[in-house]
């Protein structure tokens, strides 16, 4: 039953209750039968399960297989388990980093529970009792007054100037006036939650007045429960980076298996026999190639680079809760933003007025309100009245001083039916009454007006001026209040509205609005320059939403605004045809937000969703990246979000997008560097195998992959953003990891380094034997190891820019210089410390040989620079041809 469409008597009958409430026995029976009034939460994942989930990554699985094979070979050959220990250490470190960043349990449901009131005042058998809110049942009569949290969903049966703050549920920035009358459905199929004026909902707060309601839904059956259910069922999809790394892992897996099988077959054919020793030797060479092809440090490097991004973002007030969200921001194409508290300040403010004397008008409005102000100017109270008191304060009028001078002696509280409020105050010569409320209602009760300090009879011309001023303010989406006064010789004999609110003297209008955050317009402009589409989704009225959207540049030519009711009337097919033209959604419900986000995602757009209310949580979790507000945001939203804005500043999102783009650029540099290194190792080992000698052992490759390469790779992750990073269109989230020519770069750079390494092996072999014979040589292996290490160190500087010359970059990367020095020192230590050199089967290296290795390795810089220059020239040529065409 839709209780908001039924009379209160019908509702009471349907829930088998009465105006006196339930008996204690019946309440207990219902509690036992239906359960407690709380939100259920799914069990969280144990820490050990989260740890093992890190092992599901294909790259990690490859490493574990490599460790297992190395362990078996170590047992068979009686050698050390150094390879196994090194690989498992890498896996363990990566898993710990992943768990550390992502092990925060999902607390959205717990936060929802915390929003519930701890206890409630209810009628049981006609007697007022206080019971824990968890023990409320359908049929209970709950009493509400200002400051109370609504403990469950209910149909109002009494209301006295009751206003409910529902921003967390609906996005409506102004408390909603409530009444007990049934609602008329009209032509609409249903009434949006924000317009159900005779209902109260769990999670909202009483802002003003008092009332009572019969409970119609508890626990998971409430509107809050529906949100909790949607939140628990929402699934986290993979981020673009996760998808790309997963694809890369699969490519590497098949590549490793294919090349290893080829090398194994070539070795067997070269040997000409099939005994155990030959098979084992061939298998060992194949394993060496597998170790060479697998970038053991890649998973850890990406995790650490993302972690560094998390730290950098936190310094810019963007708190990342989900590690991979750092990168996802970089390819965001759509930002669906809540209005209240996100684009606006969530603080009603008077911005315009019409009347004879602004100070006198503000004083009257402040006196005819129940909001209060302290000595510091901080205002508390219902938002609309708080705006009036704050307006007076800005004009130098302290309400406390006004109250002391004009003592209130009687009043007619605000009532949603008559839309007015009146207060009467003592003066030296009698009393003065101030009445404020809806302009059309108040104007009809005025027989005079004030102009230039004189009271004049109301005329049609002046009435027209007031109506035009009202229309002008309303057209700007301002909430307009009118004010009038009346003089009394003595205290009125009655405080009934019918007696007080007549023969009034009109004094003016004021227009207020929840103003936009001052930095948001610039942030949205920057978003558009970066190719990001901003969308406003709000529970507020469509006129208000559209006006603010136009002011901010969200609603532009060719786009329009719709309401949630209009959206509900569209089928999925119809919506899919028009959603790209809609920039503003007003009066929406939670399921609408999720539908909007899903429509953009289904069309292939990487979508972010910002918000602060409970109503935003399901859509935040459904989006590619959910952005919660740290100050005004509810715990529910913050728990569901991937990122939380510590300063609630929309502009922080732009900074986070820039950081996300920088991080992704740097991750690509890391991947290209590490894969290029592995490519050179694969080519070197494959070529050496074909020529009949062993160039490097598995332990050498592990050292290069995990020590020599990882330090520079991490430093590349700290590279500064390129100047045009926020002028680019968002990258295609579906583009492969090798897009933009990176695959070709990896291959040619691998060939260059492998050529230098093979040359160094021959030089070392010649220095040891005096011949160029192609045989195994410990000295040649040592030289090859040194040269590969040096070449990778030098090559890391090439990777600072994919196409730009390293000699033209605007700034240096101090971290890269330090990491290069650290890698050089580590390489020297492993060659010079006798115990390590013996473990790696290295021979002594002279200064001349060090110089030769450094010189040969350094050749990678001029070679890559020449290729980059050719690539830039080709790109310019293609661009000029395109312009000519």
Tell me the role of every PLM-derived stretch:
Residues 708, 781-796:
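Generic alpha-helical transmembrane segments
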Residues 769-772:
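Membrane-interface interhelical connector segments
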Residues 1-730, 737-738, 751, 766, ...:
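Conserved cytosolic headpiece of P-type ATPases
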Residues 799:
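A C-terminal functional module that forms or caps the active site or interfaces directly
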Residues 278, 774-775:
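Outer-pore turret/helix-boundary of cation channels
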Residues 680-681, 745-757:
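Core segments of transmembrane alpha-helices
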Residues 732-751, 775-783:
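Membrane-water interface at loop-to-transmembrane-helix junctions
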């Amino acid at each position: 039953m839709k209780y908001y469409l039924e009379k209160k008597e019908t509702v009471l009958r349907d829930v088998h209750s009465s105006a006196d409430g339930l008996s204690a026995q019946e309440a207990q029976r219902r509690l036992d039968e239906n359960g407690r009034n709380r939100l259920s939460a799914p069990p969280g994942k144990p820490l050990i399960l989260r740890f093992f989930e890190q092992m599901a990554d294909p790259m990690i699985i490859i490493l574990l297989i490599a460790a297992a094979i190395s362990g078996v070979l170590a047992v068979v050959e009686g050698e050390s388990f150094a390879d196994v220990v090194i690989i498992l250490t890498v896996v363990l470190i990566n898993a710990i980093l992943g768990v550390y960043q992502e092990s925060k349990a999902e607390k959205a449901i717990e936060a929802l529970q915390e929003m519930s009131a701890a206890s409630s005042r209810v009628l049981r058998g006609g007697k007022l009792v206080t019971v824990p809110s968890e023990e409320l049942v359908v049929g209970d009569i709950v009493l509400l007054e200002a400051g109370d949290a609504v403990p469950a969903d209910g149909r109002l049966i009494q209301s006295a100037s009751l206003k409910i703050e529902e921003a967390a549920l609906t996005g409506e920035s102004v408390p909603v006036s409530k009444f007990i009358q049934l609602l008329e459905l009209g032509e609409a199929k249903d009434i949006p939650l924000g317009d159900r004026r005779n209902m109260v909902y769990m999670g909202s707060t009483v802002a003003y007045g008092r009332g009572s309601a019969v409970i119609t839904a508890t626990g998971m059956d409430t509107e809050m429960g529906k949100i909790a259910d949607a939140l628990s069922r929402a699934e986290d999809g993979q981020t673009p980076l996760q998808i790309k790394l997963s694809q890369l892992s699969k490519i590497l897996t098949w590549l490793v298996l294919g090349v290893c099988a080829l090398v194994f077959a070539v070795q067997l054919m070269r040997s000409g026999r099939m005994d155990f020793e030959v098979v084992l030797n061939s298998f060992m060479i194949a394993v060496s190639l597998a170790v060479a092809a697998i970038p053991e440090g890649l998973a850890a490097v990406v995790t650490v680079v993302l972690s560094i991004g998390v730290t950098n973002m936190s310094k810019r007030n963007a708190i990342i809760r989900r590690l991979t969200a750092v990168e996802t921001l970089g390819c965001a194409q759509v930002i669906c933003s809540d209005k209240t508290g996100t684009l606006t300040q969530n603080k009603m403010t008077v911005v315009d007025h019409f009347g004879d004397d602004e100070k006198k008008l503000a004083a009257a409005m402040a006196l005819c309100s129940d909001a209060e102000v302290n000595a510091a100017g901080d205002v508390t109270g219902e938002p609309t009245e708080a705006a009036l008191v704050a307006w007076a304060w800005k004009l130098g009028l302290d309400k406390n001083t006004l109250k002391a001078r004009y003592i209130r002696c009687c009043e007619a509280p605000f009532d949603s039916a008559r839309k007015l409020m009146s207060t009467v105050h003592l003066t030296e010569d009698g009393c003065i009454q101030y009445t404020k409320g809806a302009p059309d209602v108040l104007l009809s009760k005025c027989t005079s007006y004030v102009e230039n300090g004189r009271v004049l009879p109301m005329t049609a011309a002046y009435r027209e001026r007031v109506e035009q001023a009202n229309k002008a303010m309303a057209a700007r989406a301002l909430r307009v209040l009118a004010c009038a006064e009346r003089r009394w010789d003595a205290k009125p004999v009655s405080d009934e509205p019918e007696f007080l609110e007549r023969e009034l003297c009109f004094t003016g209008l004021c227009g207020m609005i929840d103003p936009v955050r001052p930095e948001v317009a610039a942030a949205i402009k920057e978003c558009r320059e970066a190719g990001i589409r901003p969308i406003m989704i709000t529970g507020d009225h469509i006129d208000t939403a559209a006006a603010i959207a136009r002011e901010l540049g969200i609603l532009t030519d060719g786009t329009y605004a719709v309401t949630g009711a209009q959206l509900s009337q569209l089928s999925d097919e119809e919506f899919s045809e028009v959603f790209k033209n809609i920039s503003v959604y007003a009066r929406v419900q939670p399921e609408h937000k999720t539908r909007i986000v899903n429509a953009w995602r289904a069309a292939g757009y990487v979508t972010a969703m910002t918000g602060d209310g409970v109503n935003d949580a399901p859509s935040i979790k459904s989006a590619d990246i959910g952005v919660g507000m740290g100050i005004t945001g509810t715990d529910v939203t913050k728990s569901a979000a991937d990122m939380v804005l510590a300063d609630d500043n929309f502009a922080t999102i732009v900074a986070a997008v820039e950081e996300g783009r920088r991080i992704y650029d740097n991750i690509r540099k890391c991947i290209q560097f590490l894969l290029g290194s592995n490519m050179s190792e694969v080519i070197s080992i494959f070529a050496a195998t074909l020529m009949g000698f062993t160039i490097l052992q598995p332990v050498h490759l592990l050292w290069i992959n995990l020590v020599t390469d990882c330090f520079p790779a991490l430093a590349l992750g700290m590279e500064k953003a390129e100047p045009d990073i926020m002028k680019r269109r968002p990258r295609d989230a579906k583009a492969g990891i090798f897009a933009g020519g990176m695959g070709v770069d990896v291959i040619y750079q691998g060939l260059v380094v492998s050529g230098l390494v093979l040359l160094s092996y021959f030089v070392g072999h010649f220095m040891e034997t005096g011949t160029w014979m192609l045989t195994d040589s410990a000295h040649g292996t040592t030289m090859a190891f040194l040269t590969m290490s040096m070449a990778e160190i030098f090559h890391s500087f090439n990777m600072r820019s994919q196409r730009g010359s390293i000699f033209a970059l605007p700034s240096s990367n101090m971290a890269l210089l330090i990491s290069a020095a650290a890698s050089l020192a580590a390489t020297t230590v492993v060659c010079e410390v006798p115990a390590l050199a013996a473990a790696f089967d290295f021979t002594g290296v002279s200064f001349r040989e060090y110089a030769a290795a450094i010189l040969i390795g350094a050749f990678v810089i001029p070679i890559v620079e020449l290729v980059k220059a050719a690539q830039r020239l080709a790109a310019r040529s293609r661009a000029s041809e395109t312009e000519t065409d």
